[in-house]
Amino acid sequence: MHTVMWMSYDLGVKGDYEGLYAWLDDHDAKECGNSVAFLRYEYSADCLSELKEDIARHVNLDKRDRIYIIWREAQKIRGQFLFGKRKAAPWVGFGAQEVQVDEED
């Protein structure tokens, strides 16, 4: 079986980009802008588990590294962190905010 997906990655300044780039190249991934790739991934049973194990075998990751994938499953678009977790967005506070009134009940 196979699926197509977008992968976003943030390995920081000391990350194993060489290992990740070799893995992406081995999977004929296409570059889609800064730290984003598009690829087709072949798997036998459980795509996410196999993908996570495959990347972990080829890329030296630490606890701060993040890899997020976006794929289609059963006519829905899904996204999930394979490694790492969501951080506070850098754009928080730049948009128009409603004025909040503090009052005592």
Regions found by a protein language model. Give the residues of each.
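Phosphate-ester processing/binding pockets and catalytic centers
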Residues: 1-3, 14-105
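Active-site-flanking beta-strand signature of metal-NTP-handling nucleotidyl enzymes
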Residues: 5-9
